[in-house]
C-alpha cells in the first residue's frame, strides 16, 4: 500500500450488496462501528465520502482485498441516528473514483487516496443514444414496474447522457458484479451501449 496523500484522502465506507452510481440519490442503513465512525467524521467536514462495494457481503471487517478498486465519491445529504444504534443516511453519488491506496492509520475507520474519474463531454450521438435508452426503459417499465413511473419522469428531466445511463444502471435488475462493471466502465459510449444491451435482454 502506498502512502495516502492528505489532499486526496477521503473516509471510505464499504457497502454490502449495493453499487452507488454518480448522480443517483440512495438511502442506506449503516450498522458497523467503523462505518458509523466514518460517517460521523464526514459530517464534521465537507460531507464527502467514498462508497465502495464489497466483493463478498459476508465479510464483516473488510480489508483492501475485500473491496473493489472502483467506488463512487459521494455526498451525505442527510444522517439520522436510529434508536437501535444504526444510522440511516441519504447519499448522492458525485463522481466515479479509482481507489489508489487504502489507509488503516486511523483505527476508527478506513480512508483512501482516490483519483476522480471525470465524466466525458457529451456528444450529439450520445444524446441520441441516451434518449433511446429512456424510451427502451419506459417501455420495459410499463410492462412490469409500477414504481418506475417516477424514475422515468426523472430520466426525462435529465440532460446529461452519463447521468441517464447511471440512473438506469442503478435500477437494473442485474447482479452486483454486473453493476460494478458498469460503474468501472468510464467510457460513456460503451456504457450507454452496455446498458442498452442489458435492457434488450430484460425485454426479451
Where in the sequence are the language-model features?
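N-terminal low-complexity, acidic/polar interaction/targeting segments
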Residues: 1-204
